[in-house]
């Protein structure tokens, strides 16, 4: 079994994946994009008869899927699968699954951080410091 993992978020769990896949004698290849994702043409270039893809936001369209003759399963790291041509996959017996809730913690943390940033005027302070000014709110004491 050959597996291609392109989702950058999986890099921190690489040792766990390696241990898990070694139990199944799977050949795992990690290729991460320099930016957020691979486009369809880049996916064609890195695909090498893998049976399973674990992807992030990579473009998995009909152009790529036509060249992926050995592909049997696509796993989307995260909830949304709008980057995957699901109709083509259904018609060609390629199963697609996702991992809803996997990124929920990170989305929640980011949301709280943005709220805190607004509450503390962090961006206003960054802008004023970059302009050579020091914005200081009046003291309440």
Where are these regions (language model features)?
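Phosphate/diphosphate ligand-binding glycine-rich loop within oxidoreductases
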Residues: 51-130, 140-141
């Amino acid at each position: 079994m050959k597996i291609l993992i392109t989702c950058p978020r999986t890099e921190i769990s690489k040792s766990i994946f390696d241990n898990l896949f070694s139990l199944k004698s799977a050949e795992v290849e990690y290729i991460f994009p320099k930016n957020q994702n691979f486009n369809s043409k880049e996916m064609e270039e890195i695909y090498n008869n893998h049976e399973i893809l674990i992807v992030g936001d990579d473009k998995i369209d009909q152009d790529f899927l036509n060249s992926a003759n050995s592909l049997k399963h696509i796993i989307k790291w995260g909830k949304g699968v709008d980057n995957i041509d699901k109709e083509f996959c259904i018609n060609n017996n390629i199963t697609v699954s996702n991992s809803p809730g996997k990124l929920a913690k990170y989305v929640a943390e980011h949301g709280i951080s943005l709220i805190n940033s607004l509450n503390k005027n962090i961006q206003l302070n960054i802008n004023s410091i970059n302009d050579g000014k020091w914005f200081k709110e009046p003291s309440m004491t």
